[in-house]
Regions:
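Charged, low-complexity intrinsically disordered segments
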Residues: 1-163
Length: 163
């Protein structure tokens, strides 16, 4: 099986798989600058902390700030709900943009790996560092790819989030 490794949002073409890739998405009635913004908006317990995160000057700084939240600022149940939220955010991202839909579907059966370079707990959860990690972002993308491919089998157009 072939493998597609991605990490930096600026790397063509598969940097678009990064949550830091700058592409607006509509999620839960709000327009977010990136899928990272949509994902992290669910993490804070307090609206003031959410606003502070959403005002970060870049998606990378947003991610760093969100990873450093104190436990009392994190929504109850986040550790168990975050994967479902990421699944929903990715579905919104890849169904709202035909080019991203085609890019994901075009990876065929390749293993998708977020290949991080800095070894830490977060990078080993969402990706792999030196081949070690759960690669949850890659796993969720492959799950979404299979779902979208099955839904698209009888259609000539991409699936919209409303469908």
């Amino acid at each position: 099986m072939s493998e597609i490794r991605f990490y930096r949002s600026s790397e063509k073409p598969f940097g678009a798989f990064s949550n830091l890739y700058r592409r607006e998405i509509e999620f839960e009635g709000t327009t977010f600058a990136t899928s990272e913004h949509a994902y992290q908006a669910g993490k804070p317990r307090k609206p003031a902390v959410r606003k502070w995160l959403m005002d970060a000057p870049s998606p990378a700084l947003l991610a760093m700030a969100a990873h450093g939240l104190y436990y009392w600022d994190v929504a109850p149940g986040w550790s168990t709900s975050k994967f479902d939220r990421m699944r929903a955010v990715l579905r919104a991202k890849f169904t709202q943009h035909p080019d991203l839909f085609e890019l994901l579907i075009g990876t065929s059966e390749a293993r998708l790996v977020e290949a991080a370079t800095v070894d830490n707990e977060v990078n080993r959860l969402w990706g792999e560092v030196n081949g070690v990690g759960r690669n949850m972002l890659g796993e969720l993308l492959m799950e979404l790819r299979a779902e979208l491919r099955d839904q698209d089998a009888d259609s000539d157009t991409y699936i919209t989030a409303a469908e």
